[in-house]
């Protein structure tokens, strides 16, 4: 995946694959604990990509979502991005990622954009579009929908 990212994005970014590879560069295991699989960064952006073969709801939600937020590198300044890439993305995984992104932005007082992708969508957006813009659009649309809903609801304040 790192080579494909480089082929699509070029020299604009620095790439740091953290997964374990053999001498030919073929991955054979995930990244060690408390670190994401692939980190991509430049002066004003930090992008964490977690790649997994896990497809089940319980495993995705429990093993591949909230951990991403712990893996985000707070030492890099600028806007942060996160992608979860799997053969299948469960709808609960997508919802949890959206909500946790908003909570994380509020807690850390910094911009964070995220989106889970199935493998074919991730390949297509990298090849034909702008993954960064796609993550931004997805996050801002969710924020807008949430804001619209909250503005319409008149709950008693206590």
Residue ranges and their predicted role:
Residues 1-158:
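Catalytic core segments in nucleotide and nucleic-acid processing enzymes
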């Amino acid at each position: 995946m790192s080579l494909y990212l480089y082929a699509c994005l070029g020299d604009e970014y620095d790439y740091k694959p953290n997964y374990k590879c053999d001498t030919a560069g073929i991955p054979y295991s995930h990244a060690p604990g408390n670190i994401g699989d692939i980190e991509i960064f430049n002066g004003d952006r930090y992008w964490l990509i977690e790649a997994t073969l896990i497809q089940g709801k319980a495993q995705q939600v429990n093993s591949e979502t909230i951990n991403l937020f712990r893996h985000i590198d707070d030492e890099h300044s600028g806007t942060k991005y996160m992608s979860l890439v799997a053969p299948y993305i469960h709808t609960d995984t997508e919802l949890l990622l959206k909500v946790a992104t908003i909570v994380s932005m509020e807690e850390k007082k910094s911009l964070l954009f995220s989106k889970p992708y199935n493998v074919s969508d991730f390949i297509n957006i990298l090849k034909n579009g702008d993954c960064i813009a796609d993550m931004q659009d997805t996050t801002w649309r969710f924020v807008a929908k949430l804001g619209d809903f909250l503005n319409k609801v008149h709950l008693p304040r206590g």
